[in-house]
């Protein structure tokens, strides 16, 4: 059975984007990017909402040859090799390879996906992750805390959801980012 993993890069005060929608402060440096790539190798399916898909679809045509930073090349190859499911009621179609569009994020469908997937599944974006967390579908949370306080914006974790977490791993990076890996206790 595959794990459903929610990963997010957030500010120290818990936001994935500031109140203006900016998240440029969250771009990983080479060290963090290589670490993320190691985690992403186990992902076979990405689950995105519309907004996150619009950000991530860059990787479908990202350069994978010489001249690009090697961590970015590696991530592009990993992303291109994975399946993607986009949940949106406003999109009519998707343009990236290995991608399908669904209109509803159904609990039973995700449970079935977890039961049949041969590799782990990543849910990305705080809105879609909130649905998965609220319905008890997430097995692990991978949080990267950036050394910045933005004072408001889009929260990484939903309001009104109580989770009992068990710390599985932690790591500090040279740029001040801290990685925390938690198991979500049912």
Report the location of each language-model feature.
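Enzymes that bind and transform nitrogen-containing heteroaromatic metabolites
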Residues: 1-186
């Amino acid at each position: 059975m595959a794990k459903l993993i929610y990963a997010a890069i957030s500010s120290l005060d818990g936001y994935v984007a500031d109140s203006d929608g900016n998240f440029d402060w969250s771009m990983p440096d080479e060290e963090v990017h290589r670490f993320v790539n190691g985690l992403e190798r186990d992902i076979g399916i990405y689950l995105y909402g519309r907004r996150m898909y619009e950000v991530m679809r860059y990787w479908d045509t990202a350069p994978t040859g010489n001249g690009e930073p090697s961590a970015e090349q590696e991530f592009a190859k990993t992303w291109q090799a994975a399946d993607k499911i986009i949940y949106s009621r406003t999109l009519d179609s998707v343009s990236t390879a290995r991608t399908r569009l669904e209109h509803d994020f159904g609990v039973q469908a995700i449970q079935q996906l977890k039961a049949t997937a041969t590799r782990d599944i990543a849910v990305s974006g705080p809105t879609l992750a909130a649905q998965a967390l609220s319905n008890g579908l997430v097995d692990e949370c991978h949080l990267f805390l950036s050394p910045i306080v933005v004072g408001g914006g889009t929260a990484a974790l939903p309001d009104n959801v109580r989770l009992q977490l068990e710390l599985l791993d932690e790591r500090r990076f040279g740029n001040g980012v801290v990685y925390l890996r938690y198991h979500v206790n049912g």
